[in-house]
């Protein structure tokens, strides 16, 4: 399956070992010029065959690989840089023209109705991209699942709210552009994936950290309709997650006004005319001034979201579908000394509560996991994001000295993830049962 017909035109991919990968498919018009800080617009049809043969630029974000000019870099940042971002082969240029997705499919023809995995990357809503070193679709293709990875606008580019933007919007709102990008990408996949051999009625959205939070947002908005069949939240989505409920409309507008004042722009036209690299520099300076790394977040705006995610779940306003969710042992800086006292990440409790609520509301408890495997090579244990190498099957891309136990766990996790995508169950009942109020079972991944 090297060439596929879509609603926008023909697309040609690259054939690999028994599968085809389509890199850099546009799912929206580039959000540049007058489209900066507007909802994503549909792609115009093209003539001929679009060559989906290379990954595209990442959205504007702080460049953690750049020279820091002598500034002290937090220890955790240097660790994450070594873990994921220091390989030049997987580093990307930055551009506002970044709304692309990638598809790995094992299908040989349209209409095979294979399950679809729709991945949303993490990064605190301010960093990351769709083809990071740890992401790959080969292992999913080998298990009969199509993998889609997407990019979306980040930070200020994806979440700026301001009165100027409210004035030009018919709904008198602004912000949430990154979430709207995710919805546009999901809609594109829903409308086109059957031509790639996928089943549009069996799409599982999943993500880690901000990608998990995004997945929770997508099951909490009416704008995604019936496009989601299942969802997996990894170290992010959960009940009573403050990161999902802390940004109020008033606070978001106030931050937007403060930032725009720092730019010196006197009008929206001036703001949109500013060079992207200059705006990104000002954004990073503003963040340093406020002493907050994550300032620009999705927010309840009355349209994309009418209530926060906790209220959505409590009121039964999330999609009534199968869920799988979990966290890692050392998530959110839980140290070995804390573990000795029995302390777990706040996300752990939130996962249990989520499952109890889905059981209470529609008698369908969720599947909960706890990743406790300590990665070899250093003392970081089961850190935030440690599971990514395993559930993508990309151990060989990592610097760590992985052994037989790691490869066994990798194979197990790929089986759990893809079985859930196929059936709504990660394993047989005797191996992994749902987490119920009367039987709060949690699958240990080690």
What are these regions (language model features)?
Residues 140, 220-224, 377-383, 435:
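Short glycine-biased active-site loop of nucleotidyltransferases that positions the nucleotide triphosphate
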Residues 230, 238-245, 262, 266-407, ...:
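Substrate-gating cap/lid region and adjacent catalytic-acid/histidine neighborhood
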Residues 1-176, 200, 292, 403-413, ...:
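Non-catalytic accessory segments of hydrolases
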Residues 8, 181, 199, 300-301:
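Acidic/polar residues in short coil/turn loops that connect beta-strands
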Residues 82-265, 313-333, 358, 363-364:
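Serine-hydrolase-like catalytic core of hydrolytic proteins
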Residues 153-155, 206-210, 369-378, 432-438:
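Short, solvent-exposed turn/loop segments enriched in Gly/Ser/Thr/Pro and often Arg
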Residues 20, 96-99, 180-183, 187, ...:
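A structural signal for well-ordered alpha-helical segments within the folded catalytic domains
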Residues 437-446:
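C-terminal domain-tail junction helix/linker
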């Amino acid at each position: 399956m090297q060439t596929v017909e879509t609603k926008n035109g023909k697309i040609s991919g690259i054939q690999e070992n028994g599968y085809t990968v389509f890199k850099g498919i546009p799912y929206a018009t580039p959000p540049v010029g007058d489209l900066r800080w507007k909802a994503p617009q549909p792609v115009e049809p093209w003539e001929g065959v679009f060559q989906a043969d290379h990954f595209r630029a990442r959205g504007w974000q702080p460049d953690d690989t750049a020279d820091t000019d002598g500034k002290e870099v937090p220890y955790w940042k240097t660790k994450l840089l070594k873990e994921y971002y220091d390989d030049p082969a997987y580093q990307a240029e930055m551009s506002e023209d970044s709304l692309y997705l990638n598809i790995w499919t094992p299908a040989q023809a349209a209409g095979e109705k294979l399950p679809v995995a729709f991945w949303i990357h993490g990064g605190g809503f301010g960093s990351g991209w769709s083809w990071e070193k740890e992401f790959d679709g080969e292992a999913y293709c080998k298990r009969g699942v199509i993998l889609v990875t997407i990019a979306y606008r980040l930070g200020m580019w994806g979440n700026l709210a301001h009165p100027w933007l409210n004035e030009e919007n018919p709904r008198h709102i602004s912000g949430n552009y990154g979430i709207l990008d995710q919805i546009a990408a999901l809609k594109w996949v829903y409308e086109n994936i059957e031509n790639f051999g996928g089943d549009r009625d069996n799409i599982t959205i999943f993500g880690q950290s901000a990608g998990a939070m995004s997945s929770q947002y997508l099951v909490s908005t009416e704008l995604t309709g019936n496009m989601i069949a299942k969802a997996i939240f990894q170290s992010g989505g959960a009940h009573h997650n403050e990161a999902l409920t802390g940004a109020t409309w008033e606070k978001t507008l106030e931050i937007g006004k403060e930032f725009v004042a720092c730019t010196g722009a006197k009008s929206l036209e001036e703001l949109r005319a500013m060079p992207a690299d200059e705006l990104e520099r000002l954004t990073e300076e503003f963040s340093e001034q406020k002493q907050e790394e994550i300032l620009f977040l999705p927010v309840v705006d009355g349209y994309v979201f009418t209530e926060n995610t906790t209220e959505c779940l409590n009121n039964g306003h999330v999609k009534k579908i199968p869920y799988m969710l979990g966290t890692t042992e050392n998530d959110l800086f839980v140290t070995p000394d804390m573990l000795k006292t029995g302390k777990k990440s706040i996300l752990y409790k939130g996962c249990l509560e989520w499952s109890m609520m889905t059981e209470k509301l529609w008698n369908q408890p969720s599947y909960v996991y706890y990743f406790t495997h300590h990665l070899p090579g250093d003392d970081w244990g089961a850190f935030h994001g440690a599971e990514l190498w395993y559930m993508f099957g990309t151990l060989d891309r990592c610097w760590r000295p992985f052994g037989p136990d790691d490869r066994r766990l990798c194979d197990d996790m790929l089986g759990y993830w893809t079985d859930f995508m196929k059936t709504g169950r990660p394993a047989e009942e005797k191996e992994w049962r749902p987490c119920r109020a009367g039987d709060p079972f949690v699958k240990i991944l080690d």
